[in-house]
Amino acid sequence: MKIAIAGYGVEGVANYQYWNKPGNDLTIVDQTHPSQKPPDGVPLIIGEDAFHNLNGFDLVIRTAGLSPYKITTNGKVWSGTNEFFSRCPAPIIGVTGSKGKGTTSSLITEILKAAGKTVWLVGNVGVPALDLLEKIQPEDYVVYELSSFQLWDIERSPHIAVVLFIEQEHLDVHTSMEDYVDAKAHITRFQKSDDILVYNGENQYSKQIADESFAEKIAFPTAQTAHVVEDAFYYGEQLICSTNELQLVGTHNQDNACAAIDAVWLTTQDTEVIRTGLHAFTGLPHRLKFVREVSDVRYFDDSIATTPTSAIAALRGFEEPKVIILGGSSKGSDFSTLAEEMNQHEVHALLIGEEAHKLAQSFDVSGFTDYEIIDQPTMNTIVQRAHEIAQPGSVVLLSPSAASFGLFKNYADRGDQFIAAVNEL
């Protein structure tokens, strides 16, 4: 079988290794020379139009970040996610949303581990799913963090689907907001009445997806399911534990915990198990993580916050005065809601990157004036300016509400540079 491995990053390598079997004739295809070194002797097709000229291949395996719209072939377009779903022997809990996927997936994993289950965490937050497929047993559980890119053309849905808060994002890749939401909806599109959909009942797009689902539907947070009352988690009227057991900042993370509790409730209703699982997870890198305290000012790395809503969640996580670093490259976001939120806080904003002037325009419209634009910044100059402004007892947040490209390689590089700059103060 002639197979094209379309895209050769981390996932592309996993795809190559999985399909590198006797009888398969593999070719690696990418727009630029791959960052991962291809195996010797394997044919390469490199070029801007490489994905548009794949006729003659029986199978084209696209990496998640490659839009199926960019592939032209008379063969079948497939993905590692599709392959995993078609062959995984264990029940899959799939998690999607604009933000919180990795955190919620990790919380579900920790609760199931506390219940004594063997759990495999895969997707962006874990390892490439195909790398683990041979190890998974029918009695295990798989928790799969699923982006819109992975869900784009999926042909099966997980047994338990979790849809978190959805907002405008990735419009630099998706053709429209409708296309983005439609891709997310694949997580439940193939579910049946004996499957389960856990969804954010306070978000219009999550509810829109639920309206189309045939699965049993569980909204969160509600008085009948997982919710928070007076600093404690409840399921219905049953007390689970104090919210202090959750080692994560912000009410948005309490919502993520509620989604995780709902997702595992049919597997375990042991409140001590759930408490243990919630407490075990200390957070993922670059997700509102404490870095250091300098001169009575606390610094937090929230570089993963690439949308306005995630920056709003970071602002609401602290009552103290704040300095927030905002901006980066464009994802087509609307900053008007963030601009209105800024007026509710004692906060000074440092604006950087391509989106700095768009943010400033939104702030001007809302009447928020406590901001400055830093031209041609480095992370050291950004952090140094924050250090100069921040008063004792305040908080400095890197919560950019925009992508990182242009100034940094990716959100992780941005966060790592922030941590390094803070540690140099």
Give the predicted meaning of each segment.
Residues 51-59, 64, 68-201, 205-215, ...:
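Phosphate-binding loop of NTP-binding sites
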Residues 3-15, 27-34, 284, 303-375, ...:
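Active-site beta-alpha connecting loops in nucleotide-dependent enzymes
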Residues 25-26, 56-59, 118-119, 139, ...:
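Short active-site oxyanion
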Residues 19, 60, 95, 124, ...:
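Residue-level signal for inorganic ion chemistry
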Residues 26-30, 120-121, 143, 219, ...:
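Short beta-strand "acidic-cap" motif of Rossmann-like dinucleotide-binding folds
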